[in-house]
């Protein structure tokens, strides 16, 4: 038997219209996959899926010309990347099996099946479990099409034998990982002798691709179709039953009896063509180029090349975004800890200095922020604005309700004064009542600003020291202690401020000016009405004047207290404490890097190299196209 598994006449004509475009396109994706960037990028691909015993392995066997693992139960236990390369100069057959960083050259196609089985056992273990790890089988021959396919495990509905109980869920999860990508064409293999609407493979494909834009149906086993059902099969292939954008094709591969009779793959292709040519029902499908393995190979190559070309711009965008993010993540982790003792000390000084510099910029409201984030002081300023609104609303509310309030006081507490004389004690009591109502909002302002500063500093500590647990702990203690200390000091000052506000005081000229303004302003509030007594009118003027002055004083004083303690003093204390760590502790103790961080840095460096290599491959392809 020829290792090619295809008739010379058919295979020599395969893809002759695409020879200049086909190989470079497919080589591009194969090269990217070989670099390992499939972990990072969604590469254009054709994934082959089907229920168990759908004939999926037989189709791949016919396309590749080699015997692949087949039988009952789960045959494909790992994703198998089948890379077929058509060569013209060298007539010899070459095989290359790669998995888990192992490479095995194969000179005899008869050894493929066992080699793939051994690879599956190495990755998925003994038994019938599956693995997400990929096996790559590359075949170079003059008789194969230029094509790359990904063979996925057949869908099992019920666990049998020593299969895991959740084997169906595992397989579906693996299949979905591939076919849900917009870059993947799903090649759905379905036996022609069953109702295709009941197949799990087609259901899965339609779930992730409801319009059938990325799905091509392949019907197998046409020789097993019940008599009278042939027209239904023809209608299915003609896209009249369950329409798919890419439509359907039909093939007849070797059955078990053919294998038992030692029917070679070359003879099987000849037998397939005769079957369609001589079948009165299916002959039209052959005439429409919708039947036989060679025509399927040609169609798949065309589909893959067009799909790669279509997805190339998105692939380039994906690559650029991943490169940018990986570089940023790597910068965020920083360099690893030096081994030299002196260099370690310098490294610690650098880390603390960088941390303190960021704190300084926060204090000066000059830190760098990326959208949609906001500078710390901008958030604090928003809280100060809210505080000012509270004071303003207090003044407005006072003007609106003052008349009734003063009338009540005059009615219940007026002494021997003649009309028009202001009772100073009544004036003081009303002032103190209104100012006392501002005490709690002032304390809330302090708490809200403290939360903003705490969150920001905590984020900065994590950003700079999260890789070093001892240094992180050393930084966390003063962060919390000094915050609590400055909060208490600010809180006491606010209490003190409101105790002072119980003393009713203002400079005479300031008060006189404000009183004049109040009299001019309040005339519109009904205070000139004959129903308002002179006592009420005069008291309202004085109260409005004083509360306006007091609110203006508090509008500045409370934010000053909060800013001084929770930003200036707190950050200065924290900076000094961090500098103090340099002399107190051994750099080696503080700079003990978490193993997870070192591993992540290594992974990011490897990813960056993969992506850069992929970028060079893509760039070379684009410029040579």
From Swiss-Prot:
InterPro entries per UniProt: Dynamin (IPR022812), Dynamin_GTPase (IPR001401), Dynamin_GTPase_CS (IPR019762), Dynamin_N (IPR045063), Dynamin_stalk (IPR000375), G_DYNAMIN_dom (IPR030381), GED (IPR003130), GED_dom (IPR020850)
Induction statement: By interferons.
Origin superkingdom: Eukaryota
Domain GED: 536-625
Chain intervals for the UniProt region annotation (G5 motif): 252-255
Segments of this protein annotated with the region G4 motif: 220-223
Cystine crosslinks: none
Protein name stated in the entry: Interferon-induced GTP-binding protein MxE
